[in-house]
Amino acid sequence: YGGALKQLSIGCASSAGKAYIHSGGKVTDQHILWENCAEQDTFLEAMADAASTVAKHFAGKIAYVAVMKNLSVDCDCCAVAEDPCMNDVGILSSLDPVALDRACIDLVRNSNDPGREHFMERVNSRHGTHTIDSAETLGIGTQAYELVKV
């Protein structure tokens, strides 16, 4: 799942930082990354750790926005990403990236969109919400939220 936490980590990282996160802290050279990729949960925990660093650096000076439009199961960094499988869900914002990502996942999970099953199968098969759990454990934020429609 590529929400606020992913953008805080992978999205803010240099090429060396991206390699470091994807390898679970083993390498910073992107040319040898693919021989050193971390196990999935280790990678997700490294994303949460990197997100924690950025969130703490900008604490009190950052807001998070999620535009849930044209949702695809593939990462935005894929060279050939699958076409979007879900219709537009909405735009969410929060001062807490953990709450924002949890709310986004919950909105998808509880939607009636015909693409929901495909989307959630991909999230679940990749342990996608493990980053949210790890980020909460690191103290970045909480998974508790209140949706306010405007």
Residue ranges: model-predicted function:
Residues 1-150:
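Extended, low-polarity segments enriched in aliphatic/aromatic residues
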